Amino acid sequence: MPIETKRINQVEFLTAGGISVPHGFTTRYGGVSTGTQASLNLAYGRGDTMENVVENLRRLGSALGFDPEKLVMTRQTHSDIVRVVTDRDCRGFCHKDYPECDALVTNTPEVTLLVFTADCTPMLFFDPVTGAVGAAHAGWRGTAQKIGAKTVKAMVENFGCKPENIRSAIGPNIGLCHFETDEDVPQAMLAAYGEEVRQFIEKRGDKYHLDLKAINAMSLNRVGVTQIEISDACTYCQCDRFWSHRASHGERGSQGAVITCKEVGR
């Protein structure tokens, strides 16, 4: 099933047909922030006011059907750290100081997970058998460290999930067209994944372009996840719709990838 765009009360987000719990990859549309954060900025610490971010999170919760007070967020450092969380980790959506990690997993009903992006690759995970969910943020370093696969591993080890049951969605990121790097990035991918990854690397002059969505999908396939939906949106190409760190030279807000755990059968 394809990734689809939805708009509820002016809040625009992308959803995956295979994930049946509340979830979405947000866009810039539907919030109250202004300037470079206009308008649905979800991240603190980027020059926006706390009041704006809180209202944006309220609006997102209303659109997707989750309680913002039961959010758990990430403090992202391009690591491979995956945190297992419960309702005890919900600190309220006004709280800015969460422990360092780049992925979250839970099987606690009504807990909502949120990771932030603005070119990096967002991934969401859902197991309809156990009800467990996950969310991951993968920059090129996280991709090389296989954070998507490690998120799956955390779901398997902590919640008894089977990879073949897990449904995953890969959201908008900076595409092959604009993710230009020096040689260190493809070398990191080759060290992590071997020769198979070369098909997702293009040399253009003295620079390299990489397809990070495809590399992350390959990584998930290797650990047994085959139900993967992939957005074709590039944050750089569509920087009027998504925040792109590169296109905006760092003057930006952040969109989010969000998913809520629900009791199995409800």
At which residue positions do the language-model features occur?
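Active-site microenvironment for binding and transforming phosphate-containing groups
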Residues: 1-266
